């Protein structure tokens, strides 16, 4: 880069700072807002300012950009004795090249202007609709994410501070609002547009990361991609080091960053569990030191729930690391001791957090405690369902894993039973993260597969039929948006439940659970093939168990409405399994 280009870049940065300061002064004096700098718009859009010679300017801009190459920082020349030995290798390359892309991005918050130029201002979404959606998110939905997603109390402030967080917030709210079906696509499209536009933007802030946290937590169609990208960008901003600063300096700003890092960790572990893929975030001091964070002066009441989830997903992470990826091989008997150890850890987690969380919570009632029961059973079914790995259609369950098989069935049953019988949990369906709904889908499919493959050995078909039928009825009664996972799941579950009505004529009835029988070595499988009247295979999907890929059943069943038409896609009552 030549000196002239460096000088021009420095001038532009100086102008941005002066323009931002002047805007703040104008706002304080209640004077009209200044228009945005044309140079900023040009750089953001990747094109020069429009004028009478647009084509000529465009060609000149391209040639100049190609000539200049990657952007570099204009800083004093360093000498070898200026600093100590570099502790990160990339620092050496940055010292030699001054490439801007090699350093952590600047904090852009001080350079933000106050002009509002978003899809609401452009008329794509009415202000009244936006206010309604924002109120829904602020007053209710954000509590399901521990109060981390809503930093601002008014929509106007949110729009001024972060258009992308505004779009993410309104998208999630529209997903849950049954009156917002016609505007969900508008909000979702705007969020996707802003994400695409900012993919290579160097300057990001906490609200940018917060927007990706919100989307990763609720938007199942974007969560896998956004979660991984958000973790990378958060690492660039040293978000993972905020924990130490929050503890030592008792900084609320650092505590906010630490909470965002915890949410990213939770989403990462949730997605790794759902997809059976490796997680990205490893356990560092901030993850291992969640108790110190909870005891620090910066901790809030919501942090109890947050750190409780950090503790739980760390157990899930260890479970995944033990079993690894599904290679189609049976689980060795020696793993039984590990399973029992994990069971004790889950029991301890359940006992602790059921005791620490209060009966009622602001705006979401008793859902946190009932959610603890759900999460406990989600973890149980995830743990015990591994014993079905590698069992072919004619392979029995090894006798030493029979108790684990029953525990998995009991956990799945408890999940569905709690959702259909507890009114607080039923209300919480419209608000809970996509992970919880996905694990509910897994519990349903697990029971259906068990009932088909093993008949009444583990659970009666009629019991599964009744549970899933009632769950479908519960989902259809919810006041949620058309694109909410519960509505998308209802049609698919209804069709899968119908398969249980097929008579099980050839089912062999082994006496594997007869108390008079000792030293039972196996559970006899049910019919290997079910045929319809034409003799075709009735159940032709993979009957093996596992979470990857996506529960081993056709995900298209969740993308149709009640009529079977394809849905368009947009770019202390103990209901659980108390530990014994």
Question: What are these model-derived regions, one by one?
Answer:
Residues 140-144:
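The first (N-terminal) embedded transmembrane alpha-helix
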Residues 24, 28-31, 175, 236, ...:
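Conserved amphipathic alpha-helical interaction elements at protein-protein interfaces in regulatory
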Residues 170-181, 217-218, 388, 527, ...:
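A short secondary-structure junction motif
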Residues 3-19, 86-105, 119-131, 147-166, ...:
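Extended, leucine-rich alpha-helical cores of fungal transcription factors
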Residues 18, 27, 31, 35-114, ...:
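C-terminal, low-complexity intrinsically disordered regions in eukaryotic proteins
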Residues 286-292:
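Active-site oxyanion/phosphate-handling segment shared across diverse enzymes
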């Amino acid at each position: 880069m030549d000196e002239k280009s460096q000088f021009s870049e420095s001038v532009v940065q100086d102008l941005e700072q002066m323009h931002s300061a002047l805007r703040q002064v104008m706002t304080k004096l209640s004077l009209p807002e200044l228009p945005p700098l044309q140079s900023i718009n040009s750089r953001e859009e990747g094109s020069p300012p429009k004028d009478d010679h647009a084509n000529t300017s465009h060609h000149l801009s391209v040639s100049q950009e190609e000539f200049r190459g990657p952007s570099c920082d204009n800083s004093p020349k360093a000498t070898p004795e200026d600093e100590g030995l570099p502790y990160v290798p990339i620092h050496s390359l940055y010292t030699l090249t001054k490439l801007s892309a090699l350093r952590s991005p600047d904090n852009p918050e001080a350079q933000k202007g106050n002009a509002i130029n978003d899809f609401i201002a452009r008329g794509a979404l009415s202000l009244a609709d936006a206010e309604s959606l924002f109120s829904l998110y602020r007053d209710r939905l954000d509590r399901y994410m521990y109060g981390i997603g809503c930093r601002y109390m008014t929509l106007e402030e949110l729009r001024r501070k972060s258009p992308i967080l505004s779009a993410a917030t309104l998208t999630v709210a529209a997903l849950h609002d049954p009156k917002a079906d016609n505007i969900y696509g508008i909000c979702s499209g705007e969020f996707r547009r802003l994400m695409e536009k900012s993919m290579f933007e160097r300057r990001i802030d906490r609200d940018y990361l917060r927007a990706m946290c919100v989307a990763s937590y609720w938007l199942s169609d974007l969560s896998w991609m956004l979660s991984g990208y958000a973790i990378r960008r958060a690492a660039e901003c040293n978000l993972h080091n905020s924990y130490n600063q929050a503890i030592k300096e008792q900084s609320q700003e650092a505590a906010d960053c630490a909470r965002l890092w915890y949410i990213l960790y939770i989403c990462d572990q949730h997605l790794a569990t759902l997809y059976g893929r490796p997680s990205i975030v490893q356990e560092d001091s901030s993850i291992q030191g969640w108790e110190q964070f909870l005891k620090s002066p910066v901790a809030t009441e919501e942090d109890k729930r947050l750190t409780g989830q950090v503790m739980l997903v760390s157990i899930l992470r260890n479970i995944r690391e033990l079993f690894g990826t599904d290679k189609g091989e049976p689980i060795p008997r020696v793993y039984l001791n590990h399973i029992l150890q994990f069971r004790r850890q889950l029991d301890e987690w359940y006992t602790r957090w059921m005791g620490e969380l209060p009966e009622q919570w602001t705006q979401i009632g008793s859902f946190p405690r009932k959610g603890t029961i759900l999460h406990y059973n989600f973890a149980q079914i995830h743990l015990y369902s591994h014993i079905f790995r590698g069992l072919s259609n004619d392979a029995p369950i090894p006798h030493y894993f029979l108790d684990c098989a029953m525990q998995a069935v009991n956990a799945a049953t408890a999940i569905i039973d709690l959702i259909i019988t507890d009114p607080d949990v039923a209300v919480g369906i419209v608000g809970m993260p996509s992970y919880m709904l996905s694990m509910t889908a897994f519990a349903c499919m697990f029971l259906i597969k068990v009932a088909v493959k093993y008949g009444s050995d583990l659970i009666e078909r009629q019991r599964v039929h009744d549970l899933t039928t009632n769950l479908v009825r519960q989902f259809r009664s919810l006041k949620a948006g058309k694109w909410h996972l519960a509505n998308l799941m209802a049609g698919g579950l209804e069709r899968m439940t119908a398969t249980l009505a097929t008579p099980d004529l050839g089912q062999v009835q082994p006496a594997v659970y007869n108390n008079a029988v000792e030293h039972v070595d196996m559970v006899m499988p049910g019919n290997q093939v079910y045929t319809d009247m034409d003799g075709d295979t009735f159940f032709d999907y993979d009957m093996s168990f596992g979470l990857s890929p996506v529960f081993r059943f056709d995900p298209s069943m969740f993308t149709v409405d009640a009529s079977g038409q394809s849905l368009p896609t947009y770019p202390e009552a103990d209901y659980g399994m108390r530990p014994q």
